[in-house]
Amino acid sequence: MRVYLTLFLIIISSINFFAQELNYNIEENISYYPTNESGLTAYQKAQCRLDIYWPTQKKEVPVIIWFHGGGLTGGSKEIPQALKDKGYCIVGVGYRLSPQVKAATSIDDATAAIAWVFKNITRYNGNSKSIFVSGHSAGGYLALMSVMDKSRLKSYDIDANKVAGLIPFSGHTITHFTIREERGIPGEQPIIDKFAPLYYVRKDAPPTLLITGDRELEMLGRYEENAYFFRMMKVAGQEKIEHYEMQGYGHNMTSPAFPLLIDFIEKFKE
């Protein structure tokens, strides 16, 4: 589905003005692994932290967990400016990176962070029944993997279907290229295995909004991956899934995508 600037402006204008009048707090560098847990490395303690930005005067607000991009080799936790002052509780997550660890470890960290949010976010006025998981590029991949593979959150006694929605921005749906490169597989050689969101397509997945750049401008066939994921989810019976293609934008398509994320949250929040 191709989206134009006029649609973005309509969505932006529909945001509740009252949200901009709220006061917000931010708490940084919260460890989402127990700091007294034996076996944690110094690198894990340093990287596996999150920041929370939340409105102080309003309770049970929707929660957005945001995973940064960087190919699973770079980047750092962030709270996107475009999501601030909208009345939401925003969680920016850091995670371990390759080559310090195997890239798949990033998925373990992302899952642990989501579990922490489920169990603690009410302390920050967040609604644990309205948790949305998002991120750009590698962050979109982590969002998908952590939720589509139900066994991951199940290890924390959390049903992945309790996630209110998935909104990956230009995320891999095949096995991530960094994981493939660690195995000696070229980045342009696609595979689908247990490290691919496509491996876990299912009817009962949370509502999902896939957003990619223009098919002629995106990197590494990212549009086509998401289009295939969309189709296979439909084949599996999932009706609450959409795919938007940002015409005229490449991989760095976050700016026009954020209004779509906000509109999606307003549609599916508790």
Report residues per predicted region.
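Short amphipathic alpha-helix adjacent to the substrate-entry channel of hydrolases
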Residues: S76-V93
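Alpha/beta-hydrolase active-site loop
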Residues: V101-T122
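Primarily recognizes the serine-hydrolase "nucleophile elbow" in alpha/beta-hydrolase
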Residues: A115-E181, I192-D193
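N-terminal cap/lid segment of alpha/beta-hydrolase-fold proteins
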Residues: Q20-K58
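The feature captures the conserved acid-bearing segment of alpha/beta-hydrolase catalytic domains
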Residues: D157-G165, G171-F177, E188-A227, R231, ...
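Short beta-strand element of the alpha/beta-hydrolase
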Residues: E60-G69
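Bacterial Sec-dependent N-terminal signal peptides
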Residues: M1-L22
